[in-house]
Amino acid sequence: MRAPRVLPLVAGSPLLARRRAIADRGLVAVCLALVAVTAFLALAGPRYLVESADRGVRQAVTEAGSRGDVLAEMPPAMGTVREGVRDPRLADKLESAANDLRAVLPDELRATVQEPVLSFQSTDLSLAAPPETGLWALRLGWVWSERSAGVRWVEGAEPGASPDVRAEYAAEREAAGYDAPVELRPQRVEVGVTRATADVLGLSVGSEIGLAGAVRDEAVAVVTGIFQPVDAAEDTWAGAPELLEPVVRQAKRGDHTTTGLLLSRESIADARSALPASGHRTIVRLAVDVPALTAARAGAVADDVASITANPEQLVLSGGRTLAVSTGLDEVLGEFATRLRGVTAQASLLLVGIVTVAGLALVLAARLLVTRRRTLLEAERARGASVASVALRLLLESVPVTLVGLVLGLVAALLATPGPTAVVWGPAIAVAVVAVLATPVLGAALVARAWTGRQLPANRQDRERVLGRRRAQRRTAEVTVVVLAAGAASAVRGRGLLQTQTSGVDLLLAATPALLAAGATILVLRAFPVVLGAIGRLAARRRGLVGVVAAARAAQAAGLGVPLLSLTVALALVVFAGLTAATVGVGQERASIEQVGADVLVEGGVTRELADEVLRQDGVDSAALGTTIGTRRLNGDGGEVVTLVLLEAAAYERVRAAVDPRYGGELAGLDGAGTDGPRVLVSPSLRAETDVAGARVYDGEQRVVLDVVGDTTMTFGPEPVVVADLGTYTAATEVPLAEDTLWVSGPGAPAAVERAIVEVEAVDLDVTVRADRLASERSSALVRALQQLLLLTSLVLAMFAAVTLVLTVVATAPERGRTLSALRTLGLDARGARLVTLGELSPLVVAAVLAGALIGVAVPVVLTSALGLRRVTGELGTTELVVTPLPFALAVGVAVLALLVSVVAEAAVRRRDRLGDVLRVGDR
């Protein structure tokens, strides 16, 4: 049996492919540019998002500060032989226990934390002879870390070990036969101080400080040296700042000052023997190694932290002892993960949209290329070339172009996003597959149809049966697309873009905008004949040829499905990206209003005196006192958990109206007398319960019946709220209520609050400035990356829309040219030719703009909650879509500009055609 001959299939194919590419170099360059740009976005987008996520999680942990540290408290007896007995190896045992703790941590957590920082601190001790003014407290402390630079002794020497007075006391009693009285001398503890502490307390080398308070017996601290830290900024000192300098806190009874006395490895045993079990704490602090933390690792780290916090028995040290673990790291990482999922949802929509539009544009370019070569390809087939050989030669042309485009896109992506982040190849490969196969498949289909010998039956009935079968197949495909789009939209609404069984984003759900655009395209194509027929009839009633010809050309235009779909998807995503960017920006501002509720929020020990002083300051418009009581049960056991917010209704109404544009005036009249009790507003989610069972809360044993007069969208935390006037509620209960919140509004509120706090000497206050919180949110690396991706995507999709329209104009130019040439022989001038071109293409552009704008608005409106925007903005309530004209202006402007440029360019090309040539040659 003879082997099949391959040479006729491939002979001369590389040379022919190269010559064809050179002949159509302009269109080939367009395909190359499309592949390169799309590959760049498909490769750089995920890398940039991952790098931004890494920066975001590091930023979140850094801003959390000590809240993100893992604290493990050792048992009081850790490292001791017996309570009250001095152990000279205490420091070694504690250091060993700290290192053992890090070794038994779960793998991911251990890889993410730094070397442990060990801190031994006494409780506050009193000075036996305190200074005359203020309140003073001393703390004996020792800190250790393998990465610490330590201290430098500038005067005196490092503290050393002191005699064990209890051992001496026991020996002296034994020597005296237990009969003679023996005096127990004070336990000597050698310490070091900084120059700042020495100056404040008037200490020098050799000074003795009598210690009083939580000590076992009498004890005296002896200063042996003055030190300074080699690096005062290192985190070893973060848990004990009083060791470096006195920590002063203002109080009405005078300054409350805490100062520290530094122990050494030798003197810590003396301090431990002088202190009771309840008089000290030994804490191991594990700070996060921020550069080692990545977004991919954050989830596993959070799981490890939650596991050891809930079950610290996993951390068993030598001797079977466990530690009490406390940290807020899991909460910090959980908050970040929530935001990351929201950003990922938006980015997935954009990436799928870009790949879809790019793929459609490549199909358009391939169709144009095949159409231009139709005569050559059909002639090649007529001379005996097989369909496979035709496809092979086209494949030899598309593969190098695609590979070059991929390489260019990859190089640009690596230059734009340098770093070790892995490359995600999936989206780029999808585009590459389309770029490689589009031209060969379309070319093979063309030559296969050209010489199949299949024709429509001459019999009318048989011909109608064949055409009917084709129409049924087409309608089935169209219905399938529409049903798929509706199903995807329904699934996103029901499950959410990220609430899937998979670990990430469901690509089918992420393709919802593209599927909806496909469904809209089908509906538009179905409506096209009706609309254009009506336009044609109107044009026929008017004088002139332009309107009739343009309407007829638009109605007879074939193959508009792909251009219309590409334009619709591109413009829809331009609108969607613009509206999403605006919604995120406004949503962050709304989130700051929800979280702060005023220009400045003061929490803690607020008083009427402070509120009055704030109102007297310049730049303050209003101020309202109140209190927030969380985790109350509405209507007793089994009721909803709510936050009870008591505030000065009239004053807070002025505050809220000044900062919240959405405030609806619901607080008006809240300070009046209710029918059954204090008037209250409730969150909308509580109305179903209050309408049936009423509303009541309990203050201790006293039941307070509430009169629900309306609902409110104001939020004061994650729980539903019950808002009442402070005065009327206080009058209805016998339980005394202390204000703990002050809301302030006004352009100068931040500075005014600071001045008022100093004036009244208020203490124990937490001040939150809304502008600062908003600035912090907007500086988030993750959200900023999303905003940049939205902007870049809008511009790129606008460019794709313009390219799609230009390709459509070029593809329809030959047929239109023949029509215009014939009309020129009948007297059509150049202006009329331009109007015919404009009229023919305008319905396509108008339909794409309208459908794209509709889909671009409908997706965020219908799917707002499912898209996870609330996770990005940080809003406590539902995110509301913000509609701005800029995205619509960009979509319309790009489409109109591309259309006008294409029409003018085509007219300029046809200006070179001479009427004599048209009359002589005829059909062009």
What does each of the following model-derived ranges do?
Residues 1-42, 461-483, 525-573, 814-817, ...:
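N-terminal Sec/SRP start-transfer signal
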